[in-house]
Amino acid sequence: NHTTSAGAFLFLVNGTDAPLHYNGTTWTAPTITGITPANIISVISHKKRLWFTLKDSTQAAYLATEAVAGAATTFQFGSLFSKGGYLNALATWTRDGGQGADDYLVAISDRGQVALYQGVDPAEADTWELVGVFDVPRPIGRRCFVRYGADLLLITLEGVFPLSQLLAVDQSQSTRVAITDNISPAFASYARLYSGNFGWETVVYPKGTRLIVNVPVAESERAEQFVMNTISG
């Protein structure tokens, strides 16, 4: 969802078809120039600006502040991903549970490298800064991030991790901070068998105090879930 002074918009993208957005009344195919819109495989709203992940590319693209169409500007992450691969997903990390100056833009490669940026305008060097690049376990799926309070959870081949803790430990010790540590053998087995299937996703269900990890056992046919109580763990 992307909220602007003109209203709230729901964006739909899939990396194959032209994007659509919905304003509560009408579906519209926005005109986006500077890139091939059908290559947009995921979208986030970060600091009042839409950011797009481009399919099988190390580039992202972004629109002007509060824009829902118009000229897109590309942003290259390739030089930061020393292990190669492509940009797998983007996320916005609020860190304080709200929207503020300390929000980070998070970019992760399919090979397991995370780049963090802080700032407002990526076109202005004075207000845009690379915080760092971190090695992490390889992510599973394009929907590998979910907001969890002031943190982000990341689904990887080695488990589900709070990003704040994952970036604070050496990768050799990372499994001990996974929220899936208690079920690590089962999770590892599912990851080994089904990580290539579409549909991996973590869902937070606050009313039921549950966190659910969806595992597509048979793509588009059958899924199983890991469920955690968010209070008792």
Where are the language model's segments positioned?
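Beta-sheet-dominated scaffold domains
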Residues: 4, 10, 92-233
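Beta-strand initiation motifs
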Residues: 25-29, 68-75, 122-130, 169-171
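Structural signal for beta-propeller blades
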Residues: 18-20, 59-61, 114, 160
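Surface loop/turn motifs at the tips and blade-to-blade linkers of beta-strand repeat domains
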Residues: 31-36, 80-83, 133-137
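Solenoidal tandem-repeat scaffolds enriched in leucines and small polar residues
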Residues: 43-100, 110
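Beta-rich catalytic cores
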Residues: 6, 37-39, 46, 86, ...
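Extended assembly-interface regions of large multimeric machines
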Residues: 1-24
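Asp-box/WD-like beta-propeller blade repeats and closely related beta-sheet repeat scaffolds
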Residues: 23-47
